[in-house]
Amino acid sequence: MTDYLVRAIAKSGSVRALVCVTTATVGEICKRHDTLPTATAALGRGITAGALMGSLVKTGQRVALRFEGNGPLKKIVIEADANGSVRGYVGDPKVHLLRPDGALDVNNALGRAGFLTVAKDLGLKEPYRGTVQLYTSGIAEDLALYLVESEQIPSAVGIAEFIEQDGTVAAVGGFLIQAVPPVDPLVVEELMTRIEQLPPLSELLHEGGNPEQILEQLLAGIPYDILEKRNIAFACSCSRERIERVLLSMGKKELSSMKKDQHGSEVTCEFCGERYLFDEADLDRIIAEIAKQES
């Protein structure tokens, strides 16, 4: 089934909500990185967070999330855009930690101490950046803290996954609810109560709940309009041409040394695992191009 996100706003204009299912996208990305179950859960949460944040920027803009902790997973890096494209990776895909009750321990895998940095490429000279300390290292709570502290928007975020014992991605999804200025404290209180009473999100997802059905439960009793429905999918912007531009920037001396010592160059994209091979003839051509630019 195609992953997608719905965006809605209360008819009163006081609340906006985003709900998405990312199961297929997470499955594809985790397969590319050959992740173990806990790393799969962590990456799945990050991808979902990225999809939610990507829907808040305008066409042509991008957002990057970087969760860095002191645990064995080390980091979760996600990039997403306004079109629903998302990509990501973790520092160590082979991390697999369990809590005493047998649940996947994403929090300690990432590490309790660390930071979340959000960078938005809004088409300006420099991207906008905001950083907060990790709150729980569970991803959803950390993103909510960022939105409240850095963007000053009262927000509630829920992200959940259902990973089978064999590591298969059975269901992943999430929601983001925000109070729209001027903020009504009573509306915020009502929403928080409603979220607390919601059945476990992982159960709703595993039972086949789609974004519209989850949205209906989140905003039960609150009249709302669905503004948009957009597909979410893995997409990587890497290409041989981009890698070649990086090699061009390295200079003749380093490329000549690479040719002599390694007889070529192999570059692997961290986001998708695609391998790009440049043999000695390729390096000679790039070195010649540098010489031409310098003359």
Curated annotation (Swiss-Prot):
UniProt keyword annotation of Cell cycle present: no
Location within or outside the cell: Cytoplasm
Post-translational modification: Under oxidizing conditions two disulfide bonds are formed involving the reactive cysteines. Under reducing conditions zinc is bound to the reactive cysteines and the protein is inactive.
One protein family per Pfam: HSP33
Disulfide partners: 236-238, 269-272
Major site of localization recorded for this protein: cytoplasm
Alphabetic keyword roster: Chaperone, Cytoplasm, Disulfide bond, Redox-active center, Zinc
GO cellular component terms listed in the entry, alphabetical order: cytoplasm
Single GO biological process annotation from the record: protein refolding
InterPro entries: Heat_shock_Hsp33 (IPR000397), Heat_shock_Hsp33_C (IPR016154), Heat_shock_Hsp33_N (IPR016153)
A GO molecular-function annotation: protein folding chaperone
Keyword Disulfide bond: yes
Family note: Belongs to the HSP33 family.
Function, in words: Redox regulated molecular chaperone. Protects both thermally unfolding and oxidatively damaged proteins from irreversible aggregation. Plays an important role in the bacterial defense system toward oxidative stress.
PANTHER family noted in UniProt: 33 KDA CHAPERONIN
Designated name of the protein: 33 kDa chaperonin
Lineage summary: Bacteria, Pseudomonadati, Thermodesulfobacteriota, Desulfuromonadia, Geobacterales
Underlying gene: hslO
